Amino acid sequence: MQKHIKEYLKHFDLGEQSLITCEYCLRSGRIDAGGFDIHHIQGRGEGMDVIGNLVCLCRKCHIRVHDKGEINKDQLLLIHRYFLIGRKIKFRK
C-alpha cells in the first residue's frame, strides 16, 4: 500500500476494508459505494503525504479532477478543510 494511502487511513483510524466516503460527494449528501482514491491536493512534487494535502475521492470525482478539470485545487482544499474540521482534526499545510 502506498505511503499516502496509509497516512490517510491512519488519521481516520480506518482499515483497508473500512467504508470510506468521497469528501466531494459527501458535501452534497451523496455517498458513492464504488472504488476510492486518495488524491494529493497539491501534486506530489508540490505537497507532501500529510493529511492536509490528502483528500479521499470516489473514482468519478477523481476523473472530474484529472481528466475533465471540473473540480479544481481550491475547491478540494476548501472541502477538505471543512471535512477535517468536522472531525476535529487540526489542519496543517
Question: Can you name each region flagged by the protein language model?
Answer:
Residues 1-2, 36, 90-91:
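Nuclease and nuclease-like effector domains acting on nucleic acids or nucleotide cofactors
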Residues 1-24, 47-48, 52, 76:
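Short, charged surface segments at domain edges that flank catalytic/cofactor-binding sites
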Residues 2, 30, 72-73:
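Alpha-helical interaction segments
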Residues 13, 17, 29, 67, ...:
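Short linear sequence elements within intrinsically disordered, low-complexity coil regions
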Residues 23-56, 69:
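Histidine-centered nuclease catalytic patch
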Residues 45-55, 63-93:
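Polybasic, low-complexity binding patches
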